[in-house]
Curated annotation (Swiss-Prot):
Coiled-coil intervals, chain numbering: none
EC number: 3.1.26.4
Species name: Syntrophomonas wolfei subsp. wolfei (strain DSM 2245B / Goettingen)
Subcellular localization(s) per the UniProt record: Cytoplasm
Cofactor comment text: Binds 1 Mg(2+) ion per subunit. May bind a second metal ion at a regulatory site, or after substrate binding.
Binding site for Mg(2+) 2: 9, 135
Keyword match Cytoplasm: yes
Record text on subunit structure and interactions: Monomer.
Record keywords, A-Z: Cytoplasm, Endonuclease, Hydrolase, Magnesium, Metal-binding, Nuclease
Enzyme class: hydrolase
Name the record gives this protein: Ribonuclease H
Domain RNase H type-1: 1-143
CDD domains named in the record: RNase_HI_prokaryote_like (cd09278)
Length: 146
C-alpha cells in the first residue's frame, strides 16, 4: 500500500494570539511543505489546523498515512478515543461541557475516514528533524502576519 508520512506542528505567540501551523508531507523521495497563520487563535487550534490542511493536501483516497505530532491534545483525542466519545456524547466532554474547537474536530473527521490514518506522538523540541522543521514553518507563518 502507498504510504505518506506527515509531520505537523502548531505555534502561537501568546495563547490566544497570532498563531501559525506547519506541515511536511513525504511520499518516497517527494516532500511538500505547507504552512498558514491566523491573527487571533490558540495553540491547540493551530495544532489541529496543521493536521487538517496536511490531510486536505493529499489527493485521492486509499492511502496509508502516518501523522506525527507533538500535540498531546490531538494524539490523545485519537488514540484514547476522546473524539469518538465526544461525538457519541453530543460534543460534550467528560465534564459535560462543550468540546473546544468542535468546528475543527468536525472538519477533521471526514479527512481521517478518507484514508487509513495512524497517529504517533513525537516529543516536541527534542531534535527531531521534521518536527523542528514544522515548528520553523509555523513560526515563519506567524511572522508573515506582520
Amino acid at each position: 500500500m502507498k504510504e505518506i508520512i506527515i509531520y505537523t506542528d502548531g505555534a502561537c505567540s501568546g495563547n490566544p494570539g497570532p498563531g501559525g501551523w506547519g506541515a511536511v508531507l513525504a511520499y518516497g523521495e517527494h516532500q511538500k511543505e505547507i504552512a498558514g497563520a491566523e491573527a487571533d487563535t490558540t495553540n491547540q487550534r493551530m495544532e489541529l489546523m496543521a493536521v487538517i490542511e496536511a490531510l486536505k493536501a493529499i489527493k485521492g483516497s486509499g492511502w496509508e498515512i502516518r501523522v506525527y505530532s507533538d500535540s498531546a491534545y490531538f494524539i490523545n483525542a485519537i488514540q484514547k478515543g476522546w473524539l469518538e466519545n465526544w461525538q457519541r456524547n453530543g460534543w460534550k466532554n467528560s465534564k459535560k461541557e462543550d468540546v473546544a474547537n468542535q468546528d475543527l474536530w468536525k472538519a477533521l473527521i471526514p479527512l481521517l475516514r478518507k484514508n487509513r490514518v495512524r497517529v504517533e506522538k513525537v516529543k516536541g523540541h527534542s531534535g527531531d528533524r521534521w518536527n523542528e522543521r514544522c515548528d520553523q514553518l509555523a513560526r515563519n507563518a506567524i511572522k508573515s502576519l506582520g
